[in-house]
Design a protein with these regions (language model features):
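Conserved GTPase G-domain substructure that encodes guanine base recognition and part of the catalytic core
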Residues: 1-301
Length: 301
């Protein structure tokens, strides 16, 4: 389900300092001839995807209810400001019953048909203290659906960042360890080889969507480390847009994969070669040996 493009009035709800930073960042994109930005938000259920969408927009554009399951279909929020259009696509969680929800993934892919993904926000919780194989499966499912290139356009977003780390750990140390563990899983799930790691600088941004988020003297929402997180997130998104990698256009081929008939045609020469060397040649040798034996004089046997 998609919404009509509306005037981005939610930006007026931000603190003046935040508004100024956001308009400067969007102005830089327009200078680079980027007039439309489409952000895809993905991850497990209950991690704060919809709340993050609402925080960026500055209004309750997507329904959020902690006591109800997520919407089963994607939803695109579109807002326009001074000739710039921002599209954010909220999606259902990719896990159901401890496994990848293939049906949800298929619905997401069909929804994205003929759309261009400029940035992927991969959302998880900062206060999830461990990663496991399920995280790897989610990353692999995204990679299998949209290709490895999607991670060149990605930002890892860790929600619930207004926390006190366990065991008296310094906040920065805890965030570094948590994000490092998740980034390792992303590399494994995306199938990025060791030689790619230097080129794979996946940015991580911390966010706090709840009303209890602290504020600084400029009335901006800030994290325990003092970062004004809304402009920090938007700044990181604009940096990804400008990093030189290509946006992901979701066409039918990307969704359905290679044509099996075309794939079969590519295998025909290989099959013929194998048949020749392992079937035809041995038969020819055997026939030649038989002819040679039959042509010998009986006394030579």
């Amino acid at each position: 389900m998609a919404s009509l493009i509306r005037e981005w009035v939610g930006i007026n709800t931000f603190a003046s300092a935040t508004q100024t930073k956001l308009l400067e960042l969007l102005g830089k994109l327009k200078q680079e001839n980027v007039n439309t930005l489409t952000i895809l938000v993905m991850g497990k259920g209950g991690v704060g995807k919809s709340s993050t969408v609402n925080s960026i927009i500055g209004e309750r554009a997507v329904s959020v209810n902690p006591f109800q399951s997520e919407a089963p279909t994607p939803f695109m929020v579109s807002r326009s400001r001074a000739g710039f259009t921002l599209n954010i696509i909220d999606t259902p969680g990719l896990i159901e019953g401890g496994y990848i929800n293939d049906r949800a993934l298929e619905i997401i892919k069909r929804f994205l048909l003929n759309k261009t993904i400029d940035v992927l926000l991969y959302v998880d919780r900062l206060d999830a203290y461990r990663v496991d194989n399920l995280d790897r499966q989610v990353v692999k499912a995204i990679t299998d659906s949209f290709g490895k290139g999607i991670w060149n356009r990605a930002v890892v977003v860790l929600t619930h960042a207004q926390l006190s780390p366990p065991d008296g750990l310094p906040y920065e140390d805890f965030c570094f360890k948590r994000s490092g563990a998740l980034l390792k899983v992303v590399r494994l799930g995306a199938g990025l080889k060791r030689r790619n790691k230097q080129d794979f600088a996946l940015p991580v941004v911390l966010v706090e969507n709840s009303g209890r988020c602290n504020k600084n003297e400029n009335d901006e929402k800030v994290l325990p480390n003092g970062t004004a997180w809304i402009p920090d997130l938007v700044k990181t998104i604009t940096e990804v847009v400008s990093n030189g990698s290509k946006s992901i256009f979701v066409d039918k081929k990307l969704i359905e994969g290679p044509n099996p008939n075309e794939r079969g045609k590519l295998l025909i020469p290989l099959i013929f070669a194998l048949q020749y060397f392992f079937v035809v040649k041995p038969i020819e040798r055997a026939i030649g040996d038989d002819i040679e034996r039959e042509s010998r004089p009986s006394w030579d046997n």
